[in-house]
């Protein structure tokens, strides 16, 4: 039996080596698109094709020193951060209610909420613009934040409900016996155990809001000083009918940093929250 196991491992050795080599080559192929902006960002004469770069930090200096790009980044943080806060608050309340209370038509309501995710944004942007125009919300941060939050709320509601479902109701009932109110048990018992759901929802919402292009393009068409980074990146691509590839590469790198940083931050937080929730459950 030991001999057969050794022979099987010996046969699997070359196959495993080939599999790792294939995965390594595939990973390198997938990383090539990320190599271009890194090289073009430090190239004084960057072009569309990769070549030995003429090393310079002029493109980074241009972005950092120009107040226009700092304003674009600030606008993106205001819009994405505001939408994330609104979605977290609404989805936490709605997800808890859908998880803990039964009412007629709950399943129909949940699937109806999910169905709205199938409607493309291009089909709703015109009526959305008309509604926000009637409410005097066009060309305002509030209008864009509410619009993006409404688009992201269905998925967030499903996520939060799923995480609340993983928290046993018996823990809440035990806290009621100890004198806590429903609100108190939701804050002190349920919320810490459902913390991974908050992190996942915040991550998805922020990334979607940060990368949203169509909604701010239409709703902020009359206020260029409030446009986010996504629109600024597009305008840098078509400015003067001449593409500054080095500047575009730097903007693309800067544009991705917040989402990547938030991912790693939330990833560590999720690990800690999951361990804490497991210990509390014991």
Model-derived regions: residue spans:
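Short, Lys/Arg-rich, polar N-terminal cytosolic tail immediately upstream
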Residues: 1-12
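A structural signal for multi-pass alpha-helical bundles of membrane permease subunits
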Residues: 16-282
